[in-house]
Amino acid sequence: LIAATDGFAEARKVGEGGFGRVYRADALPSLPRVACGFAVKTALVGVGAQGLAELQSEVRTLSAACHPSLLPLLGVCLAPSRACLVYPLCRGGSLEDRLYRSPAALQRLRMLGFETAPPPLSSAARLRVLRDAARALHYLHTLSPMILHRDVSAGNILLDERGNGYLADVGLARAAEATAGAQVSHLSTQRIFGKPGYMDPIILNDGQASQLTDGFALGITLLVALTGRGALGLLSACDDALEEPDTAESIAAADAGWSAAQAEELARLVVGLAFVRKKKRMPLAEALPRLEALVEAAGAVEETAGAEERQCDLCYDAPRSVRFACGHALYCEACAPRVLERDTNCPACRRPALPIVDTGAGVAAQTTFVYQSPRARHNCVYW
């Protein structure tokens, strides 16, 4: 990792977050070369023995999570003196940088390969990215044990070169443990995670994180994407428009081209997800189909994946050659049995993966996603 980043050179730094700094690496000997390159996250200081044990536990948890819209963890270097996490490099930048377009944001985008400032994201592009992140978050919540992200924000949603969205930085997530044989729906902690403006008042008051507090942060992210403004104080600043969603076009970012209908529906989702009283909040499972419907109405259809994106999601070293009963083709024939040993449900849509309906080299050459109507029971794009 030191060699791949030129000694963690400043010229290769593409970002900085709660875990530490992020550096661009073009190639790593132990991983298949990919055109997008790699992002190496390194802790600012040594983690120590206790921190190392916590990080090892976190890595084991994240290794069991696999979804097309969840940024995959490709490799780790865990040592008390320096801890590093390796991910694919998302050259489209973060949703936050693409929305705010500040001098610092544009500098980070230049480090990712943008020669000039990219145009503002359209409403359709924003909806598509938000939908992708919501899919990944809902997937984390359906795992057993459940994984809470606890740091959802526009800065933790990344874009690839084709405009697909990926939920990143699940490094602060914790697996919710079963108590007395029952699955718990929340997680209490003395440590407060999250960014200012995105943190649920429930967490600030009693430290109790849940699917609903993740949903609150997603609701704020929807509002950030709608307005193009920073999250801090945004909910109260938009209070009038949120009380009357049919006026939400008045707070919509002009450069995105939001329609009145899009702004109104997005405002209603914000209100549902970020309602002050927890008992009246909208579950993410209810909000996701409505986001799907917005994307479908906007015509924001995914581009066909290229050959590189058709590589196995687990080893990244062989083409996808196994198609599950649900329609997803995610793994090569060597890796598919390893995935099914952990769970007989498809990691992407949680539908039964068995029986395997197709195998062989031809799977990767076929169209790898099929859109379903939001009215269908399971709403996802099949990769």
Model regions and ranges:
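RING-type zinc-finger domain of E3 ubiquitin ligases
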Residues: 306-365
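Catalytic-loop of the protein kinase fold
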Residues: 144-159
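A short, low-complexity linker immediately N-terminal to eukaryotic Hanks-type protein kinase catalytic domains
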Residues: 1-11
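Cytosolic eukaryotic protein kinase-like domains
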Residues: 27, 33-60, 71-127, 163, ...
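Protein kinase catalytic-loop region centered on the HRD/HxD motif
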Residues: 135-147
